[in-house]
Amino acid sequence: MSRVGKSPVALQGAEVALSDDRITVKGPLGTITQAANRLVKVVNDNGTLNFEPVDESREANAMSGTMRALVANMVNGVTKGFERKLTLVGVGYRAQAQGDKLNLSLGFSHPVVHQMPEGVKAETPTQTEIVIKGINKQQVGQVAAEVRGYRPPEPYKGKGVRYANEVVILKETKKK
């Protein structure tokens, strides 16, 4: 059995509703629903969830660990939430959050407007910082990757959009 799948998930004040094909986690920040896998049996045990493979196949063992990790992220999301910080490095690079849109000036001839999906919010504490928050870890990471994709850090000067903890290794320019 998967080592990850063996450890139980503590609910930390979240409510879980189990049905045949869905797992719904409800907490103070919202509700997330995930499709349940048929190879994994989920058992609610007084405030903890246990994940057991239905049979001894390799696929069922792997899926028990995957389902446990997904549900643990759901519980974390509805209780604490997830956030990803981005930094803009470059002259004239700016970001501004307006409702469900993120306006970016990244050195193009036009401003870039990124539409935020439902359940994900963007904040701009300063003009060169973006904080993306939400309850779904996958969505928060996807939005952060899309915003970074508009102008990834280039390897010579390091200009572009980067994650707050990202280290950009700069190349040396050609010498004559």
UniProtKB/Swiss-Prot annotation:
SUPFAM superfamilies: Ribosomal protein L6 (SSF56053). Keywords: Ribonucleoprotein, Ribosomal protein, RNA-binding, rRNA-binding. The keyword Protein biosynthesis does not apply. One of its GO terms (biological process) is cytoplasmic translation. Belongs to the universal ribosomal protein uL6 family. Part of the 50S ribosomal subunit. NCBIfam families: L6_bact. This is Large ribosomal subunit protein uL6. It comes from Paraburkholderia phytofirmans (strain DSM 17436 / LMG 22146 / PsJN).
